[in-house]
Amino acid sequence: MTPQAFYLVLEQAGFALTNHQKEQFDTYFKLLVDWNRKINLTAITEENEVYLKHFYDSVAPLLQGYIPNEPLRLLDIGAGAGFPSIPMKIMFPKLDVTIIDSLNKRIHFLQLLAKELGLEGVHFYHGRAEDFGQDKQFRGQFDLVTARAVARMQILSELTIPFLKIKGKLIALKAQAADQELEEAKKALQLLFAKVLDHQPYQLPNGDGRYITLVEKKKETPNKYPRKAGIPNKKPL
């Protein structure tokens, strides 16, 4: 997917980008490739692939109508090189974006990226989701939590739901096996007082299959969740 094809698909979906936004995506691509030589950010570095499998894939929830262009607080867990939240922020500048990532080198990249792109209302924190999920500054503070290819839903739900306000939503982007994951996660979602609202398959423009799963928080998360760092992974709910 060339940059021009990316812009055209967005325009056809009703999201025409300004020249400034196009420049931001171009700068993002160049910085991603440059920094990837120093630290491992992505296995995908060819321009057309980045625009398809990183940029388009990241903004798919916007194109599907799951996120409005409003000043909502969005948390991205394990964003790596900034996906999906930074492409979302470029398209919807009103979003207030927070990223938590466990690798400090990636946080340094994201700080530089935000500065080069001229982004405001972006915040980066180094650490584990399990620790931040028990911090009053973060727990129950977000309208939206996004996660792309972070963990199976059974684990992911414990890492993300505690951050949401009541009626806040988790938007999980999955490449495959999403139906099976949801079946496995039934108990976890019950324990966390969360409910699946939507679970939609869609395709990238090249035909690759993807899923978006939308989960709503119904009540306050019990205090014992999330458990200590590493436990959700070793002993899923």
UniProtKB/Swiss-Prot annotation:
Q: Where does S-adenosyl-L-methionine bind?
A: 78, 83, 129-130, 148
What CDD domains does the annotation carry? AdoMet_MTases
Entry GO MF terms: rRNA (guanine-N7-)-methyltransferase activity
GO CC terms for this protein?
A: cytosol
Q: Does the keyword Glycosyltransferase apply?
A: no
Superkingdom of source: Bacteria
EC main class here is transferase
InterPro entries membership: rRNA_ssu_MeTfrase_G, SAM-dependent_MTases_sf
Gene3D superfamilies noted in UniProt: Vaccinia Virus protein VP39
Biological role stated in the UniProt entry: Specifically methylates the N7 position of a guanine in 16S rRNA.
User: What name appears for this protein in its UniProt entry?
Assistant: Ribosomal RNA small subunit methyltransferase G
